[in-house]
Amino acid sequence: MNGRWAYYWVQIMAHNLPILWFALMVGLLLMASGLFVKGSPIQLADAIWVLGSLMVMSGVAIKLFDSLKTAGLLLVVTSLIWFGVLGCLAWLGVSLTQISVLALVVVVTLVMGNLVHLLASVLREMARGAFQHDAVAESLKLNAMPILLSNLTTTFGFSVAAFFDSQLIEMAWVVGLGALISYLAIVTWVPLILLSWFLEFRVGHYDDRHGFLDVVRKMQRYPRWLQAMVWLSLTLLLISGVYLSQFMVSLIPVAMMLFACWMLLWLVWRDWQVSLMAILTSLAAIVLVLTGYFSVQSVVQISAVVLIVPLGIVLDDSIHYFSRYLRSKQGFFNTAENCHRYALSSVGRPIWLTTQLLAVGLLVLGFHPDEWIRQASLVTLLATLLASYIILLWLPAFQLKS
């Protein structure tokens, strides 16, 4: 999605605010009314846990964004999307099992990640001197395609996995519905709110654009250490893969999910190497975390759900990073060094913000009484942190020239 479409879209919305606000309120009421007419598809206790996680993430966002209004917007939009998904599930007559509730965790993290990338870009453009309406258009231009691709890969991956494992069918429905409503909110609800309600002005910081590059330069002072880390990481990854294969109940859904996501990225990006890097980066983080997690406790078998849920979440940040990487690669500054520099300076901070918020939210869910939710939340938390380290520090440090 390039060109002027985002500016035209924002102008159309700005000239039709009353009609759009009416349509938004009617749509929200229709979706949410399912909760009152048909009843909630999940238990009240699970809803309280998820809402508590959202509240904690929004509280932390006040500090990370230096903006009370931005944190409030995150909470309101994420909650509206979540209630909209529950309402639609109620209208469809879907009653979620305890395993399927994990899909709601995926939806919440997906929505939060999408909003963080969109709002971080808005604040960055405003700090560079843009009026908020122009900043919204520029943010949509930069993030609409990565967010769409992120939602599609997550939905497509769960759908393919569900084809081979029937217990994932409900999860695929929930994730698909959440991804659809999430994207509609990104391109309609959020711009509509930002066209009617102004955020605080935030002065940009040096670390927003150059913080990660400075850390990478420090890592490059020890080239032998970096080379040793490459071989050590590859060795650990190989050992971890062999170790996990002994306990996995079925690897077919996982393998097909990975292949489906890679094919989708390849079709959109037209670059099989970058697509493969995005998939392998996410997979490596999850495999290493799962090995460490299950090596310290007794385990007889591991369900594919424990691997698929974090993979659907961790892959999102990889898509955002490599979308910017590919944007530079297809332009004039197309060397690996310049591509990493552009990706780090443009999307490094939003990825780090997303990682911190998701870590806090997943930590709350890590105390959930249900074993499935607790286990998947903790594994996803650790995998998110490790994936961010690989994407933002390790990979650039290895490929950038000193």
Language model feature labels by segment:
Residues 1-245, 250-402:
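Membrane-embedded transmembrane helical bundles of large multi-pass transporters/channels
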